[in-house]
Amino acid sequence: MTAPIAKLSFWGVRGSTPTVDPATWRYGGNTPCLELIAPDGTQFILDCGTGLRRLGSQWGAPNGNGGAETHIFVTHYHWDHIQGIPFFAPFFAENNKFHFYSFRSKFLGRDSLKQVFEAQMALPYFPVDMSAMTAKRKFKEVEDGDTFTIKENKITARWLNHPQGCLGFRIETPAGTVVYATDNEPGDPKLDENLRELAAGADIFINDAQYTPEQLATTRKGWGHSTWKHGVDLAREVGAKTLVLFHHDPDSTDRMVDSILRNAREEFDSVFAASEGMVITLGSAGDNVQAHMPGARATLRREAQFRAKVTGVTEGGKEFHEETIVRDISLQGALISLQNMPRLQSELQVTMETPGEDGLHSTMHLRGYVVRIDAGTEKGHSAVGVVFTD
């Protein structure tokens, strides 16, 4: 019997506002949007930030006109979690059907999410109003503590600590449990307990990690966000299996996120930093949690043939040393064929021998960062995409 599989895709991972700074391209600049495909085929979308547009462009049918039925959870109404709504092509295809879930805001009253839709598409802020969205839409208000089922999947919603309110969601599927807890500041005992209940035993715990512990203790206190340290401590306390650091600050460069991830991995083994294009698969009861990043190369690479020695860490946490040939390289990175499967978002030490003009070989010592892992062309090998960091 085939084990149930769920697939979680990250389309937007940045917090507060989108960024196009070249120093942030590796993790991505779009604001929050995730997609979860449950084993029974149910499609969930978590938040509608600017990453939603990218999801729409990858929709299965042209223009999104495929008769899809999708469930969308909106955690709260701040700009970075709703900005993608007017640009999501499947909303404009009449054969599609969407179920929306969010809370009643004390500032808006009844039908809060519908009001948010209408307001941000009202003239003169957008060329067309909400009537142009021909897809079928249903809105459901969710309260703190609500539990409900969608086909084979159980959903629980709890309040988190964020200005004007925010919901965290726990989605239990036959393949495992995903907890989405973005935009939360620790420190309120009741709301901290809500988060513990949501995250308990989760296979994937996606947690707000916008600030460093030093920032939260000083200049960012009261802004409604958390840190990698709080996520690690909570994941360990409640027995979450894999932690995903999420909602990266727009001022955090890739190297800053790298540093946050290294700090987190020193204290908790199974940690990833959310990155656009990252896909996490969950096997039966969460026994098989794997993260990978298929996708297009950032720059054009040239064919080459350099001998290389590679040192890194496998997915199981063991150090490996391997000799190989680098056949595909650019100024920014390389595609390396490896028998050992390195951990995604881990560091590789690459020593290459390159020919000089005088016929002699010189040695280059480079530090690389694993950004993607695909099936290799050689049996038993993986094609590992590496970005050079120095």
Which functions belong to the PLM regions below?
Residues L46, T75, T182, N207-A209, ...:
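Active-site flanking residues adjacent to catalytic metal/cofactor-binding acidic residues
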Residues V271, D287-D390:
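Structured alpha-helical
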Residues R54, Q215, T253, T281, ...:
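Glycine/Thr-rich phosphate-binding loops of Rossmann-like dinucleotide-binding domains
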Residues T50, W79, E185-P186, Y211, ...:
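Short, glycine/acidic-enriched loop or turn micro-motifs at the edges of active sites
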Residues M1-V179, P189-K190, L195-R196, V257-D287:
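Binuclear metal-dependent hydrolase catalytic cores
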